[in-house]
Amino acid sequence: MFETQNSNSIGAKIVNWVVAALVNVFRSIPFIILIVLLLPATQALVGTIMGPRAALPSLIISAAPFYARLVQIAFDDLDHGVIEAAKAMGATRWQIVTKVLIPESSPALVSGITVTTISLIGYTAMAGAIGAGGLGNLAYLDGFQASNNAVTMMATIIIVIIVFVFQFLGDTVVKKIDKR
């Protein structure tokens, strides 16, 4: 999206509009509804609509547009003077992406990975509640359905701890790579 958003080419503008629209559509569908909407495609892709493998298409289709938007924001927040300087020195598009955009926005990209990972942890818990297994399944079936609040609470605490660990790791990496 970043590469095509400021282009004067009609083709690039169309590509940008289509990709941005798809990102917005898939970001706006609640995950539990996305799982249900993708059941036929999930059956065709992985051969089942139950279990951990069945959760993968929905997890990928929900996470990819989410992270794509975070990447676009990270790239948009860069000092455009740095990009213009690279262009003035004759850098190719590939060189601008690999030598300027990614290195300069790496703290924001890692933060985006952290946020996306934490969102995926929540999504996997939701997927577990409808048969994908894991802590969500445990909390729902053995906790909520069995009226066992202790199991629900324990699964929730474990999920919270996992989120804290990923947030700590992401923050640590960002601090190490941030040049500011």
Language-model segments: which ranges?
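Glycine-rich helix-loop "coupling/hinge" segments at transmembrane-helix boundaries
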Residues: 123-159, 178
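Loop-to-helix entry region at the N-terminal start of transmembrane alpha-helices
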Residues: 24-27, 31-66, 151, 155-156
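Transmembrane-helix boundary motif in ABC transporter permease subunits
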Residues: 1-19
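Hydrophobic alpha-helical segments of integral membrane proteins
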Residues: 14-26, 74, 139-143, 173
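Short helix-to-coil transition segments within interhelical loops
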Residues: 75-105, 145
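C-terminal transmembrane helix and the adjacent membrane-cytosol boundary/short C-terminal tail
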Residues: 3-6, 153-180
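Transmembrane alpha-helices
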Residues: 93-123
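Membrane-embedded alpha-helices of multi-pass transport/permease systems
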Residues: 53-57, 61-83, 113-114, 121-125, ...
